[in-house]
From Swiss-Prot:
Pfam families tied to this protein: Mntp
Transmembrane segments: 3-23, 36-56, 67-87, 130-150, 152-172, 187-207
UniProtKB keywords: Cell membrane, Ion transport, Manganese, Membrane, Transmembrane, Transmembrane helix, Transport
Protein name as it appears in the record: Putative manganese efflux pump MntP
Domain of life from the UniProt record: Bacteria
Species the sequence originates in: Clostridium perfringens (strain 13 / Type A)
Membrane topology type: Multi-pass membrane protein
UniProt-annotated location(s): Cell membrane
Function (record text): Probably functions as a manganese efflux pump.
């Protein structure tokens, strides 16, 4: 698995966390740099930790499934990517309108209870739950890493940094631009993961080598 593939996988995995970070930016008024930093640290940290856990589990079973490990990686990445796309597209126009209204209502309430809302949104408990929820996919992808012969330390550092940067920017973007980009981010992330899965399958079955030989 090349560095480029790892970077693209990092972007794909980070899109759920990015979308949630945008939502955080929407619900917070007058976002400060330390607010964005806190969100980014939680999401980036868990996004790096989960693949490591998955990799450890995958290594335990690697010898038993080595003959078809590339199919496992392909299926996991394609399933996760497809799930992200499906979840982003399943909301109809009526639901989106309701979300837009609820966001506007929450902003009005937020002006009255800004301090209380900020503490709730940025609490360690709240961020931990969200960080775990958005990094479950990374746990599954981490299992596939065990079969690819990659440097797990280098990989989780790359994934963690990408998630950190995107989530930091996501909070700021959320405050400025609202929830326009949330679903698009998840769709892009899903497509990236599916393409990475296809690439792994083609590489390990020798199809790419035959095409370019």
């Amino acid at each position: 698995m090349s560095i480029l593939s790892i970077v693209l996988t990092g972007f794909g995995l980070a899109m759920d966390a990015f979308a949630v970070s945008v939502a955080k930016g929407i619900t917070l008024t007058r976002v400060k740099a330390k607010d964005a930093l806190k969100v980014a640290l939680f999401f980036g940290g868990f996004q790096a930790l989960m693949p490591l856990i998955g990799w450890g589990a995958g290594r335990y079973f690697a010898d038993y499934i080595k003959a078809f490990d590339h199919w496992i990686a392909f299926i996991l990445l394609s399933f996760i990517g497809g799930k992200m796309i499906f979840e982003a597209l399943k909301e109809d126009d009526e639901e989106k309108a309701e979300v837009a209204v609820s966001m506007e209502v929450s902003k009005n309430k937020e002006r009255e209870f800004a301090n209380m809302k900020r503490k709730e949104e940025l609490s360690a408990k709240n961020l931990t739950v969200l960080a775990i929820a958005t990094s479950i996919d990374a746990l599954a992808v981490g299992v596939s890493f065990a079969f690819l012969g990659i440097s797990i330390v280098q990989t989780i550092i790359i994934i963690g940094i990408i998630t950190f940067v995107l989530c930091f920017l996501g909070v700021i973007i959320g405050e400025k631009l609202g929830d326009i980009f949330k679903n698009y981010a998840e769709i892009v992330g899903g497509v990236i993961l599916i393409l990475i899965g296809i690439n792994i399958l083609l590489e390990h079955t020798g199809i790419i080598e035959k095409l370019f030989s």
